[in-house]
């Protein structure tokens, strides 16, 4: 089976029409990603979060995570899935950052705490020249790695916009990657892939599109981003306008409880103010999505969770 890289990227771009990577993967894609081209070096770091974004990626279907790791990216560092740990793992991470200086993707999962000099999130330890242990904060890690990266991808809403760790009442000074970049005057390409958690297709598709641009910028321009730094490829659709219950809304047929049929707008659905292709792409291998049995809580938006609270409304 033969498939060129150009054809592969076109297939990935079919996400606009609701066809995701998980629906179009076949053996030819492996050939396209490996024939005559290097895999994208990736360093994945974790700050304040629940690891849900990593879990979502690990649940990718067609391609499965095995194929993503073996054929699409070169995952050099990931605290959850890598075999090494402790000082050895961090040492490897810094070695990779130097080896691929200016040519690796930095994926950031979780918010960055800045209060108390960032000590609310210690990501590991290193040894100095005298053999003394040095605790590395998430703040320090991003300061060290981001300027050396080719581009940074903020994976998940906590990383992209602050999310739950930065919600009202937090004492850790949690910040999004973009706010941290602004404070530290870090000028690197930043792409936000929000979601609580993001869909696997959004993460893999963004990396594929970005890496294809690196390999051939003439043929593959960077995906267009919206004002909030999100790829319109995945975040250009309004949930409400693509909802299967839209006709119920237009006819004022509103559900009174979650067990009753009808539009759930009066139960707190945030679909009208939320932009993502969830209605087309769906979740869990295309089986279902949030509005199937609950409501959209607007998890991909910059004002989540405070601006989307309460999630449910009793009418």
Swiss-Prot record:
One of its GO terms (cellular component) is periplasmic space. It catalyses: H2 + A = AH2. It is found in: Periplasm. Keywords: 4Fe-4S, Iron, Iron-sulfur, Metal-binding, Oxidoreductase, Periplasm, Signal. Binds 3 [4Fe-4S] clusters. Cluster 1 is referred to as proximal, cluster 2 as distal, cluster 3 as medial. Its cofactor is [4Fe-4S] cluster. [4Fe-4S] cluster 2 binds at residues 240, 243, 263, 269. The keyword Oxidoreductase applies. The keyword Signal applies. One of its GO terms (molecular function) is electron transfer activity. Its EC number is 1.12.99.6. It is an enzyme of class 1 (oxidoreductase). [4Fe-4S] cluster 3 binds at residues 278, 290, 296, 299. Coiled coil: none annotated. It holds the Pfam family Oxidored_q6. [4Fe-4S] cluster 1 binds at residues 50, 53, 158, 196. Predicted to be exported by the Tat system. The position of the signal peptide cleavage has been experimentally proven. Residues 1-32 form the signal peptide. This is Periplasmic [NiFeSe] hydrogenase small subunit. It comes from Desulfomicrobium baculatum (Desulfovibrio baculatus).
């Amino acid at each position: 089976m033969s498939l060129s890289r150009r054809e592969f990227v076109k297939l990935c771009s079919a996400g606009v029409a609701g066809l995701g990577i998980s629906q179009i993967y076949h053996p030819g894609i492996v050939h396209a990603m490996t024939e005559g081209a290097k895999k994208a070096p990736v360093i994945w770091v974790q700050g304040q979060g629940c690891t849900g974004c990593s879990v979502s990626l690990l649940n990718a279907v067609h391609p499965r995570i095995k194929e993503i790791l073996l054929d699409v990216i070169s995952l050099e560092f990931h605290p959850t899935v890598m075999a090494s740990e402790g000082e050895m793992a961090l040492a490897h991470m810094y070695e990779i950052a130097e080896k691929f200086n200016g040519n690796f993707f930095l994926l950031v999962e979780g918010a960055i705490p800045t209060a108390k000099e960032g000590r609310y999130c210690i990501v590991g330890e290193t040894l100095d020249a005298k053999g003394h242990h040095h605790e590395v904060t998430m703040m320090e890690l991003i300061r060290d790695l981001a300027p050396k990266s080719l581009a940074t991808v903020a994976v998940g809403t906590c990383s992209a916009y602050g999310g739950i760790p930065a919600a009202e009442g937090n004492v850790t000074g949690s910040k999004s990657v973009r706010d941290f970049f602004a404070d530290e005057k870090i000028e690197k390409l930043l792409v936000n892939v929000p979601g609580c958690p993001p869909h696997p297709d959004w993460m893999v598709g963004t990396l594929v599109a970005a890496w294809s641009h690196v390999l051939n910028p003439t043929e593959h321009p960077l995906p267009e981003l919206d004002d909030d730094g999100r790829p319109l490829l995945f975040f250009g659709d309004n949930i409400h306008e693509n909802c299967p219950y839209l006709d119920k809304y237009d006819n004022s047929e509103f559900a009174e409880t979650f067990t009753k049929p009808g539009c759930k707008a009066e139960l707190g659905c945030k679909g009208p103010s939320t932009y993502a292709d969830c209605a087309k792409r769906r979740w869990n291998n295309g089986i279902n999505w949030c509005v199937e049995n609950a409501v959209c809580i607007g998890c991909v938006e910059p004002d989540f969770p405070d601006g989307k609270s309460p999630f449910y409304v009793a009418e």
